[in-house]
Every structure is written in structure tokens, then in C-alpha cells.
Amino acid sequence: VSVTVSPPVLLIVTDVFGNTPAIASFARQFPVPCLIASPFSGEKTQYPAETLAYHAFIAEGGVGAYAEHVAQLIEANQSSLRYAFGFSAGASALWLNSANPAMAKLQQAVLFYGSRIRDYRDVQPVCPTRLIFAEQEAAFEPAKLVADLRQRNQDAELVKGSKHGFMNPYSAGFCLKTQELFLKELLNLTQISAAA
């Protein structure tokens, strides 16, 4: 009897910039098939400035609408999903879905600087979830949020000296050194699955 096993899939949930060439390049580095979720209905959307991208994101329905879109993708691909990485609004959308039973087969979710997580601290993820916050945020104090999430037994950490957007070359807070550090960690995480 032969059993066909679905390949592991990585879900990448973008920030308000959406599916940019930088995200496509990021996804190509992983040894597993990737699915990219963007807050915009168009395949590839580009905004020359973060404020324009943010206004377009709000016009699309904000985090709530994005979380619903992400839920549909998770549910449609739950048999093959093993990893989910989210950035900013994408991290918040993933966090809102992290208690969804459809995420139970994930080996790891890694959420970068999801600022709206602060509004939903009581969520209990059904899969291992790592929360990574920038040290500097305009709207809240990340150190206090991280301390509170840790008290709730969440895997939360603060990246010293970083600003919101440190993983995205289009963001004012981008930091190549920090991006490379985390990219290496994420690649190592998915390499284990690709080798199995």
C-alpha cells in the first residue's frame, strides 16, 4: 500500500505592502512550497510609500478582513501546512487565527512585529507560536507587551535596537543585519522539514 503525503507548505502572510518582489524573493529561498497571503486582491500590488500602503490596507477592511482571508487559506490548506510566517498586519492576522483548529498541524508559526496582538492578548494558539517584536514602536511599548505575553506563557521576545518593519526592505525600519539573522533561523527551521 502506497501512501501519498502532501508536501509541507509554508504560509507567508505579508505586511501592508502586500506581495512585493522582495516577498517573492524571500519565499524562493525556502526549500518547501510557499503560499503568499496578501491583504490585497490583486496578485501583486506595489505602493511607493508605507502610508499609501497602510491607507489601501484600511480600505480593504483592515486586520479583520485580512484575518478572514488568512483563515480561508489556512482551512483550504490545513492538510499540508506546516509553517506560517507573518509580518506586521500579517502577523496580527495570523495571531487572530492561531486558535483556529485548522492550525493544529503546524509545526511552527513565527510572527514578526504584529502590533495588533496587543489588543488580543488572551488568544491561546493551537500550535507552537513565536512572537517577535521590534524594540521601537510608535503606538505602544513593546517591552511591556512582551512581558505581559510571557506572563501568559507565550513565546514572546524583543529584538534590541530594532524598529517596526526590520524584515521588510520597503519599510523605514528595515535592518539588513537583523533580517539576515532571522532569515537564517527560518531557513534552518524549514530545512529540517524538507530533509524529512
Where are these regions (language model features)?
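Serine-hydrolase catalytic machinery in alpha/beta-hydrolase-like enzymes
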Residues: 2-79
